[in-house]
Amino acid sequence: MQKQTLLNIGFGNFVVSSRVITIVNPSSSPMRRLREDARQEGRLVDATQGRKTRSIIVTDSNHVILSAIQAETIGHRYTSEEVEND
């Protein structure tokens, strides 16, 4: 059985890293539409703790997760975990 690693997305919130499809910046219009569509369909998880959204994470289950941590920071955490697991 493969060990599942958790990706810290800030404020005590974690995502299983193998389920992450993409980590993107929320400032573009398509990302705003993605967020609104997910909210309307009940697929949105807000992990910002009331702070400004700085990254959007999309999972293989088509859930959209909002994080207050920069996309670059989460990306570095994601890649460093992958290197550790190899």
Swiss-Prot record:
Transmembrane segments: none annotated. Disulfide bonds: none annotated. Belongs to the RemA family. This is Putative regulatory protein Desal_2819. It comes from Maridesulfovibrio salexigens (strain ATCC 14822 / DSM 2638 / NCIMB 8403 / VKM B-1763).
